[in-house]
């Protein structure tokens, strides 16, 4: 019995080439946005879930090996990353980015502060605020973790090419909610973090 792919590719070789992006001369061209919408089929979406899962697993695993040596976990890594990206970030803003409970973040920060990776200082305008920065030791650890993950990401970028990298960014951005997009927009401009752009 014909399956969904056979039905979608029916209508002659020209139609098949239009959906696949092939020109008929052995060359390929980028698919137009929405061309055939074959990528919206259920199996394609499930495959995308597989891709996201395995990519995240293997991307984080290269850093996990270092973290395990130090008795740390991914929650500590995420905190190190965003504190390093935003020196002087408040605990409130970090909570807005990570979306974990205050108790969970308190446990994470307690370990990082006790081990000398993170320093806390009171806010200049509001002394009740706690501003977070990485110490030299914390910067060194964050850099070590970054270099491991950069190797994996750089290799993937080089293999895929510039057009695919741009497509990857557009897809991942499309998955994010408005607050995450606002943060990324600010990071691209070099602006301070704003995890609650709508006053949430």
Predicted features along the sequence, with ranges:
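N-terminal helix-turn-helix DNA-binding core of bacterial DNA-binding proteins
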Residues: 57, 61-104, 115
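Charged, amphipathic alpha-helical coiled-coil/dimerization segments
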Residues: 6, 10, 14-25, 60, ...
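Flexible interhelical turns and helix-capping residues at alpha-helix boundaries
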Residues: 45, 56, 87, 98, ...
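DNA-binding alpha-helical recognition surfaces that contact promoter or target DNA
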Residues: 107
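N-terminal leader segment of winged-helix/HTH proteins
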Residues: 1-70, 200
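Exposed, interaction-prone assembly regions rather than primary DNA-binding/catalytic cores
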Residues: 166-200
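Hydrophobic/aromatic-rich alpha-helical bundle segments in the mid-to-C-terminal region
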Residues: 38-42, 66, 153-163, 183-193
């Amino acid at each position: 019995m014909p399956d969904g792919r056979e039905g979608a590719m029916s209508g002659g070789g020209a139609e098949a080439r239009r959906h696949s992006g092939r020109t008929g001369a052995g060359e390929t061209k980028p698919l137009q946005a929405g061309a055939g919408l074959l990528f919206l089929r259920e199996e394609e979406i499930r495959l995308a879930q597989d891709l996201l899962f395995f990519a995240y697993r293997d991307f984080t695993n290269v850093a996990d090996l270092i973290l395990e040596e130090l008795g740390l976990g991914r929650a500590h890594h995420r905190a190190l990353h965003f504190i390093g990206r935003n020196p002087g970030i408040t605990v409130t803003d970090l909570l807005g980015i990570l979306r974990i409970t205050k108790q969970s973040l308190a446990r994470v920060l307690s370990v990082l502060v006790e081990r000398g990776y993170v320093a806390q200082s009171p806010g200049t305008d509001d002394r009740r605020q706690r501003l977070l920065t990485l110490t030299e030791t914390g910067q060194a650890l964050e850099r070590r973790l970054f270099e491991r993950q950069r190797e994996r990401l750089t290799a993937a970028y080089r293999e895929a090419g510039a057009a695919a990298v741009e497509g990857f960014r557009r897809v991942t951005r499309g998955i994010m909610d408005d607050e995450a997009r606002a943060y990324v927009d600010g990071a691209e401009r070099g602006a301070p973090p704003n995890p609650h752009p709508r006053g949430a």
